[in-house]
Amino acid sequence: MEQAPPDPERQLQPAPLEPLGSPDAVLGAAVGKETEGAGEESSGVDTMTHNNFWLKKIEISVSEAEKRTGRNAMNMQETYTAYLIETRSIEHTDGQSVLTDSLWRRYSEFELLRSYLLVYYPHIVVPPLPEKRAEFVWHKLSADNMDPDFVERRRIGLENFLLRIASHPLLCRDKIFYLFLTQEGNWKETVNETGFQLKADSRLKALNATFRVKNPDKRFTDLKHYSDELQSVISHLLRVRARVADRLYGVYKVHGNYGRVFSEWSAIEKEMGDGLQSAGHHMDVYASSIDDILEDEEHYADQLKEYLFYAEALRAVCRKHELMQYDLEMAAQDLASKKQQCEELATGTVRTFSLKGMTTKLFGQETPEQREARIKVLEEQINEGEQQLKSKNLEGREFVKNAWADIERFKEQKNRDLKEALISYAVMQISMCKKGIQVWTNAKECFSKM
């Protein structure tokens, strides 16, 4: 069954795109014109345009991770990791950085911040958080979320998350984000007071819109398919990398057997002993070097994982668009139904089977006064419906314009970051191979001197 062609009057139409600035690693917070839209609707949460905090260059870092024990909401003891967030103002006069704020946050507070941003900025591809538990691990890597190496990688990921928000032209001005960096006490209460949970779209409603929307925007449909494919490709890449890491670890560690054998052999040789002993030492160094190599690899894997999770952020924007398109179509359908009812009452003809037609046949016609009263009510509802439809159309067009501009910004960022990560990974592999060549060259010299 062919899909009906989109109705241009009922489908959300884009406005001309306005490219946004690309993110920087450090906040250069010259804040200009206020951005209209979701930030202004933030239930009394003001943007940070005029705050002196953003009129300086700010460095944001997650400098430490600390294991702590406390009581949860159920009054049960739990162990968790807290992260120290430091913000520093870079003074232009002498170039020295001055510590302005320092506070501790739990991972759950980072999650709360992101949930808030998703609700109030639905047209933005909100940066993802690093994984809460290790995924795509190879067998020698600990999957424990309290493992020091994993906690360190997550610390780096959380810092990157804050820098992504801080470098975004709209998110950086949000007051809740500012308070996240500066207000340690009662921050959760401040977030909850915005009422963002009540404004969040239900999963059931979003799923319903996905299957029932009649005129989806092809660009957002294609974007959703792209995000699925991107997630699939990066997942496969990470699985392959984990398998390679497993095998590479085994190959390197087996070289430790060379070292042991050469050392044992050197004990029974007089003339060849020194050369064999030296060669064995080089083999031991080679075998132990894989631990640092694979630890470095994890950082590149984490960069890929960030875009694995970005795929879900893209889908969140697409789901919001589907919801708005579905609401628009339902409003148009309701308006058309009321216009038909009004026409039927005015002419006295019923075009289709209806409960009203049945009651008329059973109980007789309405009096002219009753019919006039009903027509008047319907006309008022039609006027309200037309205004509502117009408002939804304008809101939808604004959403498409802002969302597509941010998606273009995200694509530029993605291309730049993934290119850099893949090149760095290739350079690391080349360096690893060169070290292997150097080890065997040294071993060859040892054998030559025997």
UniProtKB/Swiss-Prot annotation:
<dbReference type="Pfam" id="PF00787">
    <property type="entry name" value="PX"/>
</dbReference>
<dbReference type="GO" id="GO:0031201">
    <property type="term" value="C:SNARE complex"/>
</dbReference>
<dbReference type="GO" id="GO:0005886">
    <property type="term" value="C:plasma membrane"/>
</dbReference>
<keyword id="KW-0813">Transport</keyword>
<comment type="function">
    <text>Involved in the regulation of endocytosis and in several stages of intracellular trafficking. Plays a role in recycling endocytosed transferrin receptor and prevent its degradation. Involved in autophagosome assembly by regulating trafficking and recycling of phospholipid scramblase ATG9A.</text>
</comment>
<feature type="binding site">
    <location>
        <position position="108"/>
    </location>
    <ligand>
        <name>a 1,2-diacyl-sn-glycero-3-phospho-(1D-myo-inositol-3-phosphate)</name>
    </ligand>
</feature>
<feature type="domain" description="PX">
    <location>
        <begin position="61"/>
        <end position="187"/>
    </location>
</feature>
<keyword id="KW-0446">Lipid-binding</keyword>
<feature type="modified residue" description="N-acetylmethionine">
    <location>
        <position position="1"/>
    </location>
</feature>
<keyword id="KW-0007">Acetylation</keyword>
<feature type="binding site">
    <location>
        <position position="132"/>
    </location>
    <ligand>
        <name>a 1,2-diacyl-sn-glycero-3-phospho-(1D-myo-inositol-3-phosphate)</name>
    </ligand>
</feature>
<dbReference type="GO" id="GO:0032456">
    <property type="term" value="P:endocytic recycling"/>
</dbReference>
<feature type="region of interest" description="Disordered">
    <location>
        <begin position="1"/>
        <end position="46"/>
    </location>
</feature>
<dbReference type="InterPro" id="IPR001683">
    <property type="entry name" value="PX_dom"/>
</dbReference>
<dbReference type="GO" id="GO:0032266">
    <property type="term" value="F:phosphatidylinositol-3-phosphate binding"/>
</dbReference>
<keyword id="KW-0653">Protein transport</keyword>
<keyword id="KW-0967">Endosome</keyword>
<protein>
    <recommendedName>
        <fullName>Sorting nexin-4</fullName>
    </recommendedName>
</protein>
<dbReference type="InterPro" id="IPR027267">
    <property type="entry name" value="AH/BAR_dom_sf"/>
</dbReference>
<dbReference type="GO" id="GO:0005769">
    <property type="term" value="C:early endosome"/>
</dbReference>
<keyword id="KW-0472">Membrane</keyword>
<dbReference type="GO" id="GO:0015031">
    <property type="term" value="P:protein transport"/>
</dbReference>
<dbReference type="GO" id="GO:2000786">
    <property type="term" value="P:positive regulation of autophagosome assembly"/>
</dbReference>
<dbReference type="InterPro" id="IPR034783">
    <property type="entry name" value="SNX4"/>
</dbReference>
<dbReference type="GO" id="GO:0031901">
    <property type="term" value="C:early endosome membrane"/>
</dbReference>
<comment type="similarity">
    <text>Belongs to the sorting nexin family.</text>
</comment>
<dbReference type="InterPro" id="IPR036871">
    <property type="entry name" value="PX_dom_sf"/>
</dbReference>
<feature type="binding site">
    <location>
        <position position="154"/>
    </location>
    <ligand>
        <name>a 1,2-diacyl-sn-glycero-3-phospho-(1D-myo-inositol-3-phosphate)</name>
    </ligand>
</feature>
<comment type="subunit">
    <text>Heterodimer; heterodimerizes with SNX7 or SNX30. Interacts with WWC1/KIBRA. Identified in a complex with WWC1/KIBRA and dynein components DYNLL1 and DYNC1I2. Interacts with BIN1.</text>
</comment>
<dbReference type="GO" id="GO:0005868">
    <property type="term" value="C:cytoplasmic dynein complex"/>
</dbReference>
<dbReference type="InterPro" id="IPR034902">
    <property type="entry name" value="PX_SNX4"/>
</dbReference>
<feature type="binding site">
    <location>
        <position position="106"/>
    </location>
    <ligand>
        <name>a 1,2-diacyl-sn-glycero-3-phospho-(1D-myo-inositol-3-phosphate)</name>
    </ligand>
</feature>
<dbReference type="GO" id="GO:0035091">
    <property type="term" value="F:phosphatidylinositol binding"/>
</dbReference>
<keyword id="KW-0597">Phosphoprotein</keyword>
<dbReference type="InterPro" id="IPR037430">
    <property type="entry name" value="SNX4_BAR"/>
</dbReference>
<feature type="modified residue" description="Phosphoserine">
    <location>
        <position position="22"/>
    </location>
</feature>
